[in-house]
Regions:
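Nuclease-adjacent, charged terminal/linker segments that flank catalytic cores
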Residues: 1-121
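Acidic-basic catalytic patches of nuclease active cores, encompassing PD-(D/E)XK
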Residues: 24-28, 32, 124-175
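Conserved aromatic-histidine-acidic binding/catalytic patches
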Residues: 61, 65, 132-140, 209-213
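Short acidic/polar alpha-helix capping motifs at helix-coil junctions
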Residues: 110-116, 150-156, 227
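Glycine-rich, often proline-containing surface loops adjacent to acidic residues and nearby aromatics
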Residues: 122-132, 197-205
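Catalytic core segments in nucleotide and nucleic-acid processing enzymes
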Residues: 159-290
Protein backbone atom coordinates (compact mmCIF):
# COMPACT_ATOMS: atom_id res chain seq x y z
CA UNK A 1 0.00 0.00 0.00
CA UNK A 2 1.40 3.37 -1.05
CA UNK A 3 2.20 5.60 1.91
CA UNK A 4 0.63 9.05 1.85
CA UNK A 5 3.04 11.93 1.37
CA UNK A 6 3.51 14.35 4.23
CA UNK A 7 3.84 18.10 3.67
CA UNK A 8 7.60 17.87 4.21
CA UNK A 9 7.88 15.30 1.40
CA UNK A 10 6.91 17.94 -1.16
CA UNK A 11 9.79 20.29 -0.34
CA UNK A 12 12.13 19.09 -3.11
CA UNK A 13 9.52 20.13 -5.69
CA UNK A 14 7.92 22.94 -3.69
CA UNK A 15 7.82 25.42 -6.59
CA UNK A 16 5.53 23.07 -8.53
CA UNK A 17 2.98 22.96 -5.71
CA UNK A 18 2.41 26.65 -5.06
CA UNK A 19 -0.01 28.94 -6.88
CA UNK A 20 1.15 32.42 -7.84
CA UNK A 21 -1.32 35.29 -7.85
CA UNK A 22 -0.95 37.72 -10.74
CA UNK A 23 0.29 41.24 -10.08
CA UNK A 24 0.19 44.61 -11.82
CA UNK A 25 2.97 46.32 -13.74
CA UNK A 26 4.67 49.60 -12.90
CA UNK A 27 4.39 52.27 -14.28
CA UNK A 28 1.25 51.01 -16.06
CA UNK A 29 -0.78 51.49 -12.87
CA UNK A 30 -0.06 55.22 -12.60
CA UNK A 31 -2.89 56.63 -14.76
CA UNK A 32 -5.51 54.61 -12.87
CA UNK A 33 -3.86 55.32 -9.51
CA UNK A 34 -3.87 59.06 -10.15
CA UNK A 35 -7.49 59.03 -11.29
CA UNK A 36 -8.55 57.14 -8.16
CA UNK A 37 -6.54 59.07 -5.59
CA UNK A 38 -6.40 62.64 -6.95
CA UNK A 39 -9.76 63.45 -5.25
CA UNK A 40 -8.24 62.21 -1.97
CA UNK A 41 -5.27 64.55 -2.32
CA UNK A 42 -7.56 67.45 -3.27
CA UNK A 43 -9.65 66.85 -0.13
CA UNK A 44 -6.52 66.53 2.02
CA UNK A 45 -5.30 69.85 0.61
CA UNK A 46 -8.63 71.50 1.45
CA UNK A 47 -8.56 70.25 5.04
CA UNK A 48 -4.89 71.12 5.41
CA UNK A 49 -5.41 74.73 4.32
CA UNK A 50 -8.22 75.12 6.86
CA UNK A 51 -6.19 73.70 9.77
CA UNK A 52 -4.29 75.78 12.32
CA UNK A 53 -2.52 72.69 13.72
CA UNK A 54 -1.78 69.10 12.77
CA UNK A 55 -4.04 67.91 15.58
CA UNK A 56 -6.89 69.98 14.14
CA UNK A 57 -6.15 68.48 10.70
CA UNK A 58 -6.44 64.97 12.12
CA UNK A 59 -9.69 65.84 13.90
CA UNK A 60 -11.07 67.22 10.63
CA UNK A 61 -10.16 64.01 8.83
CA UNK A 62 -11.94 61.97 11.50
CA UNK A 63 -15.13 63.96 10.86
CA UNK A 64 -15.19 62.86 7.20
CA UNK A 65 -18.40 60.87 6.76
CA UNK A 66 -17.43 58.66 3.81
CA UNK A 67 -15.52 55.72 5.27
CA UNK A 68 -13.43 55.00 2.16
CA UNK A 69 -12.39 58.65 1.85
CA UNK A 70 -11.62 58.85 5.59
CA UNK A 71 -9.39 55.78 5.37
CA UNK A 72 -7.44 57.20 2.40
CA UNK A 73 -7.07 60.58 4.12
CA UNK A 74 -5.69 58.78 7.19
CA UNK A 75 -3.09 57.08 5.00
CA UNK A 76 -2.02 60.42 3.53
CA UNK A 77 -1.93 61.90 7.05
CA UNK A 78 0.32 59.06 8.20
CA UNK A 79 2.77 59.71 5.35
CA UNK A 80 2.94 63.47 5.81
CA UNK A 81 2.34 64.00 9.51
CA UNK A 82 2.73 60.92 11.69
CA UNK A 83 4.58 57.93 10.20
CA UNK A 84 4.96 56.39 13.67
CA UNK A 85 1.20 56.07 14.27
CA UNK A 86 -0.34 52.65 13.44
CA UNK A 87 -2.72 53.14 10.53
CA UNK A 88 -5.35 50.94 12.19
CA UNK A 89 -5.52 53.42 15.07
CA UNK A 90 -5.77 56.31 12.64
CA UNK A 91 -8.75 54.73 10.88
CA UNK A 92 -10.90 54.25 14.00
CA UNK A 93 -12.95 57.33 14.82
CA UNK A 94 -13.26 56.21 18.45
CA UNK A 95 -9.45 56.30 18.81
CA UNK A 96 -9.06 59.93 17.66
CA UNK A 97 -8.55 61.37 21.15
CA UNK A 98 -6.18 58.52 22.08
CA UNK A 99 -4.09 59.07 18.95
CA UNK A 100 -3.78 62.80 19.68
CA UNK A 101 -2.82 62.10 23.31
CA UNK A 102 -0.26 59.38 22.51
CA UNK A 103 1.25 60.65 19.26
CA UNK A 104 0.18 64.30 18.93
CA UNK A 105 3.40 65.69 20.39
CA UNK A 106 5.34 64.03 17.56
CA UNK A 107 3.05 65.23 14.74
CA UNK A 108 4.94 67.23 12.13
CA UNK A 109 4.16 70.95 12.40
CA UNK A 110 1.26 71.96 10.16
CA UNK A 111 3.30 74.74 8.49
CA UNK A 112 5.96 72.23 7.45
CA UNK A 113 3.27 69.81 6.29
CA UNK A 114 1.81 72.56 4.09
CA UNK A 115 5.25 73.37 2.65
CA UNK A 116 6.01 69.71 1.90
CA UNK A 117 2.57 69.17 0.37
CA UNK A 118 2.90 72.28 -1.83
CA UNK A 119 6.29 71.07 -3.07
CA UNK A 120 4.67 68.06 -4.72
CA UNK A 121 2.73 68.00 -8.00
CA UNK A 122 -1.03 67.48 -8.10
CA UNK A 123 -1.70 64.65 -8.46
CA UNK A 124 1.42 63.29 -6.78
CA UNK A 125 2.23 60.16 -8.81
CA UNK A 126 4.54 58.74 -6.16
CA UNK A 127 1.97 59.01 -3.39
CA UNK A 128 -0.82 57.72 -5.64
CA UNK A 129 1.32 54.66 -6.40
CA UNK A 130 1.86 54.08 -2.66
CA UNK A 131 -1.89 54.34 -2.00
CA UNK A 132 -2.57 51.97 -4.91
CA UNK A 133 -0.54 49.30 -3.11
CA UNK A 134 -3.13 49.32 -0.32
CA UNK A 135 -6.03 48.90 -2.75
CA UNK A 136 -5.82 45.16 -3.24
CA UNK A 137 -4.30 44.31 0.12
CA UNK A 138 -6.03 41.11 1.20
CA UNK A 139 -7.35 40.38 -2.30
CA UNK A 140 -4.94 37.47 -2.81
CA UNK A 141 -6.18 35.93 0.43
CA UNK A 142 -9.79 36.39 -0.69
CA UNK A 143 -8.99 34.75 -4.04
CA UNK A 144 -7.37 31.85 -2.19
CA UNK A 145 -10.38 31.16 0.04
CA UNK A 146 -12.82 31.47 -2.86
CA UNK A 147 -10.90 28.91 -4.92
CA UNK A 148 -10.46 26.70 -1.86
CA UNK A 149 -14.21 26.64 -1.21
CA UNK A 150 -14.87 25.76 -4.86
CA UNK A 151 -12.35 22.92 -4.65
CA UNK A 152 -13.69 21.48 -1.41
CA UNK A 153 -17.33 21.68 -2.48
CA UNK A 154 -16.71 20.04 -5.84
CA UNK A 155 -14.59 17.30 -4.24
CA UNK A 156 -16.88 16.70 -1.24
CA UNK A 157 -20.38 17.38 -2.51
CA UNK A 158 -22.01 15.67 0.50
CA UNK A 159 -20.15 17.73 3.07
CA UNK A 160 -20.88 21.31 4.12
CA UNK A 161 -18.13 23.94 4.07
CA UNK A 162 -18.91 27.17 5.93
CA UNK A 163 -16.99 30.43 6.30
CA UNK A 164 -16.42 33.74 4.51
CA UNK A 165 -15.45 33.06 0.90
CA UNK A 166 -14.07 36.54 0.32
CA UNK A 167 -14.41 39.55 2.59
CA UNK A 168 -16.52 38.87 5.64
CA UNK A 169 -16.40 38.04 9.30
CA UNK A 170 -14.29 35.08 10.35
CA UNK A 171 -15.94 32.11 12.00
CA UNK A 172 -15.48 32.34 15.78
CA UNK A 173 -14.92 29.02 17.52
CA UNK A 174 -17.21 30.05 20.36
CA UNK A 175 -20.04 29.76 17.81
CA UNK A 176 -18.81 26.33 16.66
CA UNK A 177 -17.98 24.57 19.92
CA UNK A 178 -19.87 24.81 23.20
CA UNK A 179 -17.81 26.27 26.07
CA UNK A 180 -14.73 26.73 23.87
CA UNK A 181 -11.92 28.14 26.07
CA UNK A 182 -11.14 30.98 23.64
CA UNK A 183 -14.54 31.79 22.11
CA UNK A 184 -13.19 34.70 20.05
CA UNK A 185 -10.65 32.48 18.25
CA UNK A 186 -11.17 33.25 14.52
CA UNK A 187 -10.91 30.58 11.82
CA UNK A 188 -11.57 30.70 8.08
CA UNK A 189 -13.69 27.62 7.48
CA UNK A 190 -15.38 24.64 9.09
CA UNK A 191 -16.21 21.34 7.36
CA UNK A 192 -19.32 19.46 8.51
CA UNK A 193 -20.88 16.09 7.77
CA UNK A 194 -24.45 16.92 8.68
CA UNK A 195 -24.13 18.36 12.19
CA UNK A 196 -20.84 16.60 12.90
CA UNK A 197 -17.76 18.82 12.78
CA UNK A 198 -15.01 17.15 10.77
CA UNK A 199 -12.36 19.85 10.39
CA UNK A 200 -11.43 23.41 11.31
CA UNK A 201 -9.34 25.37 8.83
CA UNK A 202 -7.24 28.48 8.34
CA UNK A 203 -6.22 29.81 4.92
CA UNK A 204 -3.45 32.31 4.12
CA UNK A 205 -1.71 33.60 1.00
CA UNK A 206 1.91 34.53 1.62
CA UNK A 207 3.22 36.93 -1.02
CA UNK A 208 6.35 37.76 0.90
CA UNK A 209 7.05 36.73 4.45
CA UNK A 210 10.03 36.09 6.63
CA UNK A 211 11.80 36.89 9.88
CA UNK A 212 9.54 37.89 12.75
CA UNK A 213 6.39 37.55 10.62
CA UNK A 214 7.37 34.00 9.75
CA UNK A 215 7.92 33.12 13.42
CA UNK A 216 4.60 34.72 14.35
CA UNK A 217 2.62 32.71 11.78
CA UNK A 218 4.07 29.31 12.63
CA UNK A 219 3.85 30.04 16.35
CA UNK A 220 0.17 30.89 15.95
CA UNK A 221 -0.43 27.67 14.03
CA UNK A 222 1.15 25.56 16.76
CA UNK A 223 -0.97 27.29 19.38
CA UNK A 224 -4.19 26.85 17.37
CA UNK A 225 -3.50 23.16 16.71
CA UNK A 226 -2.82 22.43 20.36
CA UNK A 227 -5.89 24.39 21.46
CA UNK A 228 -8.37 22.83 19.01
CA UNK A 229 -7.13 19.26 19.31
CA UNK A 230 -6.90 19.52 23.09
CA UNK A 231 -10.49 20.75 23.26
CA UNK A 232 -11.77 18.14 20.79
CA UNK A 233 -10.07 15.23 22.58
CA UNK A 234 -11.33 16.32 25.99
CA UNK A 235 -14.90 16.58 24.64
CA UNK A 236 -15.09 13.19 22.95
CA UNK A 237 -14.32 14.38 19.41
CA UNK A 238 -11.05 12.63 18.50
CA UNK A 239 -12.05 12.75 14.82
CA UNK A 240 -11.80 16.58 14.52
CA UNK A 241 -8.97 17.65 12.22
CA UNK A 242 -7.12 20.93 11.65
CA UNK A 243 -6.31 22.09 8.11
CA UNK A 244 -3.91 24.90 7.22
CA UNK A 245 -4.15 26.02 3.60
CA UNK A 246 -1.11 28.12 2.77
CA UNK A 247 -0.04 29.22 -0.67
CA UNK A 248 2.13 31.75 -2.44
CA UNK A 249 5.86 32.37 -2.92
CA UNK A 250 6.30 33.27 0.76
CA UNK A 251 6.29 29.53 1.46
CA UNK A 252 9.66 29.29 -0.27
CA UNK A 253 11.30 31.84 2.04
CA UNK A 254 13.49 31.01 5.01
CA UNK A 255 12.49 27.99 7.06
CA UNK A 256 8.75 28.36 6.36
CA UNK A 257 8.29 25.01 4.60
CA UNK A 258 10.20 23.11 7.28
CA UNK A 259 8.32 24.89 10.07
CA UNK A 260 4.95 23.95 8.58
CA UNK A 261 6.11 20.37 8.05
CA UNK A 262 7.11 20.21 11.72
CA UNK A 263 3.65 21.39 12.81
CA UNK A 264 1.99 18.70 10.71
CA UNK A 265 4.33 16.02 12.06
CA UNK A 266 3.54 16.96 15.67
CA UNK A 267 -0.07 15.80 15.20
CA UNK A 268 0.09 13.04 12.56
CA UNK A 269 -3.31 12.26 11.10
CA UNK A 270 -4.93 15.22 12.86
CA UNK A 271 -3.23 18.23 11.25
CA UNK A 272 -2.48 18.81 7.58
CA UNK A 273 -0.75 21.71 5.86
CA UNK A 274 -1.61 21.98 2.17
CA UNK A 275 -1.37 24.31 -0.80
CA UNK A 276 -4.33 24.60 -3.17
CA UNK A 277 -2.73 22.10 -5.54
CA UNK A 278 -2.42 19.54 -2.74
CA UNK A 279 -6.09 19.70 -1.70
CA UNK A 280 -7.42 17.01 -4.11
CA UNK A 281 -4.74 14.49 -3.06
CA UNK A 282 -4.49 15.23 0.65
CA UNK A 283 -7.89 16.47 1.88
CA UNK A 284 -9.73 13.27 1.05
CA UNK A 285 -13.13 12.09 2.26
CA UNK A 286 -11.45 9.07 3.84
CA UNK A 287 -9.14 11.29 5.90
CA UNK A 288 -11.87 13.76 6.89
CA UNK A 289 -14.16 10.96 8.10
CA UNK A 290 -11.46 8.91 9.83
Amino acid sequence: MKQERRFGDYKSEAEAWITLATGEYYPDILPDACRLYEPVLVEFERLLKASHSSTFLFTSIMETQNQWMRTQLCRVFKKYVSPQTPVEMLKRKTDAAKVCAQFGAAFRNVVEVQQKFDSRPMPDEALCAVLWEYKDRGKKGYDLTERLFDLLRSQHARLVVTGPERAGKDVLLGAVFKDYPKPDRPVDFVIYNGKTILAIGLARYDSDRGGAQEDDRTGQYREVSQEIIGYADSHGMPHVKVIYVNDGPGLLLGSMWNDYAYIEDQWPGRVKVVTLRMVPDRITAKWLRS
